[in-house]
Amino acid sequence: INRPEVRNAFRPKTTSELYDAFYDASEDSSIGVVLLTGEGPSPKDGGHAFCSGGDQKARGHQGYVGEDGRHRLNILEVQRLIRFMPKAVIAVVNGWAVGGGHSLHVVCDLTLASEEHAIFKQTDADVTSFDGGYGSAYLAKMVGQKKAREIFFLGRNYSAKEAEEMGMVNAVIPHAELEDTAYEWAQEILGKSPTSIRMLKFAMNLTDDGMVGQQIFAGEATRLAYMTEEAKEGRNAFLEKRKPNFGDDQWIS
């Protein structure tokens, strides 16, 4: 996210660009892991930010106003794409993660945080906003109901260490080593089975994502089934207008 002068706050143009980048990464078979971070430090004051949420200067009557004058909440589309893409997404929190920016890190698969600069804060109740989906409900699964309500109701600042102790950060890293560590984690994941990573991500999502999660997991299972000789026989028999012969396939107990 490249708006360091406003703590990497997002407006509709930002979220559209984020969506396009994530979509391209999702579709590109040469990509297995995505790192999400914020540009910095700020040219104004040297401050670091991952993302400070929606740019309140772009906020209109029904959402955030784009260059075309339309009101949008398209950051939710970005959240869903991160959640549903078949690849690991790592939030590299190099500074403030606030409001909608906090929700972005929550929806990512893993979070690495700068020891010196990462600060976690939910400001929804300060600006009359509320992330009623992954940003709050999924957060409660991570840190527990009471702690999640504290985070949202009080809007306090939490250090990287405090966030790690709550369970919403995987590791706290010295700032100078944060980017290199993120690449190391990505390389470790890239050394694993792509099919396993995909299926494990969707399996872990399944219990929280209802019928949508079930559909995604089932779709991936169907993809695996298509690769079997049994499936090829079914397809070929249909195309050749004959009865399929599954004689060599066994009913596995």
Predicted regions and their residues:
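Well-ordered beta-strand positions
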Residues: L110, E150, L154-R156, E162, ...
